[in-house]
Amino acid sequence: MSTTPATPKVGFVSLGCPKALVDSERILTQLRMEGYEVVPTYEDADVVVVNTCGFIDSAKAESLEVIGEAIKENGKVIVTGCMGVEEGSIRDVHPSVLSVTGPQQYEQVVNAVHEVVPPRQDHNPLIDLVPPQGVKLTPRHYAYLKISEGCNHSCSFCIIPSMRGKLVSRPVGEVLSEAERLVKAGVKEILVISQDTSAYGVDVKYKTDFWNGRPVKTRMLELCEALSSLGAWVRLHYVYPYPNVDDVIPLMAAGKILPYLDIPFQHASPKVLKSMKRPAFEDRTLARIKNWREQCPELVIRSTFIVGFPGETEEDFQYLLDWLTEAQLDRVGCFQYSPVEGAPANDLGLDEVPDDVKQERWDRFMAHQQAISAARLQQRIGKEIEVLIDEVEEQGSVGRSFFDAPEIDGSVFIDGDHGFKPGDKVRCRIVDADEYDMWAEPI
């Protein structure tokens, strides 16, 4: 008497940034298409895949900790992702891992899974169809759209190019077709991500591709114009401050894409920016920000900064605080500089900033920016906004406005039971705000 073979089961842990999350989605989509079941616990899995982060040393430590936990709880572990480029470091700590690959090695990861637990030979892909948009790890109403891999910059604090390589842009027709599938599947917000969104198409000389029979240039402006036709919110992340950023501001002013720019300025002191190998035109940047806001008064600018970079003096730090006062950024994150193995900054020969000074500067930075963010949100009280509902709880609903990217920005809280569902878009009036969040009432 024949018995039906057991369905092979895979556990999956995804660490790091949204780019890594998209890599995880792609691997999981392929495994699901081959009949694998994705399970939420180590003990139920036949094998566990850990997609690691290797951006900074604390992320590497977390990756090694999670790998160790998976080995302890399951025993069969496959490692991939950015830290995977350091196979020796991983095997030194965890010699029993079955396979180690770097980022974007989708086929190698799937093959490694095959070796541990082969797919069922009798699997019929028509019985358990994977949706056209693939497996998504985000809530159903928003999704990350990765438009390129790698980066052509050589920022001295960063090792991303050594892990993910030089810029490789995806064909714009392929990107737009994916976005179209996402919207048809119910996605209300598309978050455009890459290592360097404004450089999209540079590597292919902005060549023309085709989407639904019409020509589209492989360039940020044309991509945004096409995405705006799909009827979803379009939010731009990781936008390097090239001159071509100016070109998309009119689209924001016209309401075609969200008036939101995520631009990692990193610092303002010309001396520190030079050491970081970042653009050192902070005065010109202030003029551009002013111009952007004149064209699009609703524009929200998010950024990230590093304090305590080698050689940063108190004068440099005060320059940064003064620049923040001038720039009046809306959403800001800040990190204390952490040396990364293999980063060029380690070889600059600059004085290290003591840890207690880094902490003190971080505290001052956050207090300074919180006051700016709070004042800017106070100006929103009484105004009407559209809110995308993320969660519905007993006390009310939690959503986001065009001000807020998921996970990294604030929320909009709506008290009471209004029958909303995740993914609903609701017209509201803002009634209160603090440094990060807003409270609103439906209109």
UniProtKB/Swiss-Prot annotation:
Catalytic activity field: L-aspartate(89)-[ribosomal protein uS12]-hydrogen + (sulfur carrier)-SH + AH2 + 2 S-adenosyl-L-methionine = 3-methylsulfanyl-L-aspartate(89)-[ribosomal protein uS12]-hydrogen + (sulfur carrier)-H + 5'-deoxyadenosine + L-methionine + A + S-adenosyl-L-homocysteine + 2 H(+)
Per its UniProt record, the required cofactor names are: [4Fe-4S] cluster
Which InterPro entries does the record match to this protein? Elp3/MiaA/NifB-like_rSAM, Methylthiotransferase, Methylthiotransferase_CS, Methylthiotransferase_N, Methylthiotransferase_N_sf, NA-bd_OB-fold, Ribosomal_uS12_MeSTrfase_RimO, rSAM
What are the Radical SAM core domain coordinates in residue numbering?
A: 137-375
What's the record's note on cofactor binding? Binds 2 [4Fe-4S] clusters. One cluster is coordinated with 3 cysteines and an exchangeable S-adenosyl-L-methionine.
Q: What is its EC number?
A: 2.8.4.4
Q: What is its main location?
A: cytoplasm
Record: residues binding [4Fe-4S] cluster 2: 151, 155, 158
- Tell me the keywords, alphabetical order: 4Fe-4S, Cytoplasm, Iron, Iron-sulfur, Metal-binding, S-adenosyl-L-methionine, Transferase
Do you know which PROSITE patterns this protein is assigned to?
Answer: MTTASE_N, MTTASE_RADICAL, RADICAL_SAM, TRAM
Q: Where is the MTTase N-terminal domain?
A: 8-118
> Which residues are listed for [4Fe-4S] cluster 1 binding in this entry?
17, 53, 82
Annotated GO CC locations: cytosol
Q: Where in the cell is it found?
A: Cytoplasm
Q: Which Gene3D superfamilies does this entry report, sorted A to Z? A: Methylthiotransferase, N-terminal domain, Nucleic acid-binding proteins, tm_1862 like domain
What the record says about family reads: Belongs to the methylthiotransferase family. RimO subfamily.
What function does this protein fulfil? Answer: Catalyzes the methylthiolation of an aspartic acid residue of ribosomal protein uS12.
Provide the protein name: Ribosomal protein uS12 methylthiotransferase RimO
Q: Which organism is it from?
A: Pseudomonas entomophila (strain L48)
Q: What is the lineage of its organism?
A: Bacteria, Pseudomonadati, Pseudomonadota, Gammaproteobacteria, Pseudomonadales
